[in-house]
Regions:
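N-terminal capping segments
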Residues: 1-65
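Non-catalytic ligand/cofactor/substrate-binding and regulatory segments of enzyme domains
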Residues: 1-19, 115-135
């Protein structure tokens, strides 16, 4: 797939999500950022996992704070901002939980939480980043 010219299909997004090795939640290994890095890498062939440079909750939140928030951190990783489509990373804000990252799929966002993979309605999306340029 020419990542800069086409966009992921729903089937390829489902495949990338299902290729995630399910394991216990762990910052830097199995958290929301590691999950989106995995899916983005599977869909584009680019290594987004290299941006996961922390191994604890304190380190993760320190990086977020140093960038001025989750949105600014993701702006530094993903190039193309726009209306999220299937396979695109999204920042969501959930009641009680707060902000987290997920992958757009249909009218939902697939996120990894301390309880495993979950699908949230896309109405909670604050911002999305297009992995592929919109033509």
């Amino acid at each position: 797939m020419a990542a800069e010219q086409t966009h992921a299909t729903s089937n390829s997004v489902r495949w990338a999500i299902s290729s995630w090795k399910r394991r216990e939640f762990n910052y830097g290994d199995a958290d929301c950022c590691a999950f989106i890095a995995h899916v983005a890498s599977e869909l584009t062939g680019r290594d987004y996992r290299k941006f996961i440079t922390y191994s604890s909750k304190d380190e993760a939140y320190g990086i977020i704070e140093a960038h001025g928030g989750f949105e600014a951190l993701m702006d530094s990783v993903f190039e193309h901002q726009g209306e999220p489509r299937d396979g695109d990373p999204c920042l969501v804000k959930l009641p009680i939980v707060g902000e987290m990252m997920g992958i757009k799929l249909g009218n939902t966002v697939v996120c990894i939480t301390e309880f495993g993979l979950s699908q949230m309605p896309d109405r909670y999306i604050l911002k999305g980043w297009n992995l592929c340029q919109v033509q």
